[in-house]
Amino acid sequence: MTTPTTLSGAILDPMLRADPVGPRITYYDDATGERIELSAVTLANWAAKTGNLLRDELAAGPASRVAILLPAHWQTAAVLFGVWWIGAQAILDDSPADVALCTADRLAEADAVVNSAAVAGEVAVLSLDPFGRPATGLPVGVTDYATAVRVHGDQIVPEHNPGPVLAGRSVEQILRDCAASAAARGLTAADRVLSTASWAGPDELVDGLLAILAAGASLVQVANPDPAMLQRRIATEKVTRVL
């Protein structure tokens, strides 16, 4: 069996084979009462649509640096796997980028990173609305992710020669990092992990998302956590590990 070329293929394809419809990411926001559950199929479809948007509309590819100015959120996971389907590199800091995906409150940061590159890049804003409503009041030239992504296909041709994935690391290096992170915590495919951790840096992203999914486990990600709800959520979501 050949190893998938992209990080998205290496992580998503085994999940799709093992259990395409079971929950892989369950997202809560205790401030709004939001709960969203994604299966492997749904996550892969959103990732493919995002990759097609990046490739076809925002001119991104395997040499591209894509700034991810987003919180730990189910849509962020889809965006990241979309970036990696096309072989581009996800940038989590304020270094120069060719494309930036951000929330509306981080537009100034996005403008700064794409305008510090040799050629001014593209910016897309995510509303992160659970019903897919668009971001409003955007400046001219800024793409609304929710509006743009829905017209793109949910299948994608993966990049055969991807560039660095994250922090200059290759697909193989990130997979080794994932394996080490999972082994250090004893994670297995039987685990359901509850986390309130951020994905702000490469190591946090590996520990808080990628290592969990690469191990075949599932993630319950909670934003604005209410401590009073923790024990009940552990029981109802059948959580086996808490980060």
From Swiss-Prot:
Belongs to the TIGR03089 family. NCBIfam families: TIGR03089 family protein. Gene3D superfamilies: N-terminal domain of ligase-like. This is TIGR03089 family protein. The lineage of its organism: Bacteria, Bacillati, Actinomycetota, Actinomycetes, Mycobacteriales.
